[in-house]
Amino acid sequence: MLKEVVGLLTERQLLILETIIQDYTDLGQPIGSKTLQEQLPIRVSSATIRNEMAVLEKQGFITKEHSSSGRIPSLKGYRYYVDNLVKPVKIDSKSVRSIQSLFGNEYRRVDEIIEMSAKILSDLTNYTAITLRPEASDLKLEGFRMVPLGNGQVMVILVASDGSVESQIYNLPNNIDGESLEAVIRLINDKLVGSSLSEVTSKLQELQPLLTKYIEKSDGFIDVFGGILDKAIKEQFYIGGRRNLLNFANGNNLEQIKSLYSLIDDESAKIGGLVDNTTNPHDHHGISVKIGDEMSDRLLLDYSLVSATYNVGGHGRGMIAILGPTNMPYSKMIGLVEVFQKELTKKLIDYYRNFDE
């Protein structure tokens, strides 16, 4: 009897799962027992392979697509593979020098480096790339005010921990009085100030029932507050290759394609908001991988996000990420993101060294 490995699967089952994932990455087609028999590094009968595939399917690691006799990895299968089987590919020195040369320009502002890094990372992978500038990862909501302007209007003002200020005019409902307005200000300051900008986005929706006690139709206020928050977050990140997302959409699903178009063209912070500074339980040596429903947007069930934090000392931390299909070559992409993170960190340290002198 083959021994159990990683608590769930036998060595042979692990080998079959790994081969299915690697073949599906390369071919994009369901994998059958005959193909597996040719690909496996061990000699095993087709009947045995079918039996092992049935076990993997029953446990939810692979699934049947339509009427095909082949199998494809499930989200659970990808998760298990990334957590237990993936081995990052070592990037060759020629590719490293290529990345270094792409960063070779002189930059006058840190934002120019971060914006260029999103383009470079997108070009290297043909995926959508998201980069967060170093000062932004730890940004928190530091202050909230509503300043009366007269004629039933107030200026809603948000202050971030880096000193940046965003504001927007809000038309007050007719029946709101000064006391209710003060109660709203206290509520926001008590519940949201001190939270990271990415956390504020989700917490705001949770506050709506409380806000309704003071503002009868609170949707308008939440829209204004959310719009200001989007502007504050949007200024902290850059996106390269937005339209690459569409390359991996189901061509027969017009609704999905239309929704993805809306997502990538949205000037709010929705895509950039996927990258936050929260700890991921699935970190792989400093590289985080979120797969399918582990992301907040249901549109991205067929996508994976590979991200890494970079640290430039007293100048803060930032993040880089690629958003691509669930059948991406994880070994290669994790290795590439790891190298890119190191090279970006070097470039930023050089920039800040010159800047500080």
Language-model region placement:
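N-terminal intrinsically disordered/low-complexity leader segments
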Residues: 1-8
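Residue-level marker of regulatory loop/turn positions in helix-turn-helix DNA-binding domains and
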Residues: 9, 28-29, 249
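Short, leucine-enriched amphipathic alpha-helices that occur as contiguous helical runs
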Residues: 9, 13-17
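Short, locally clustered residues in the helix-turn-helix/winged-helix DNA-binding domain
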Residues: 21, 25
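N-terminal helix-turn-helix
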Residues: 26, 31-85
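Intrinsically disordered, acidic Ser/Thr/Pro-rich low-complexity regulatory segments
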Residues: 79, 86, 93-357
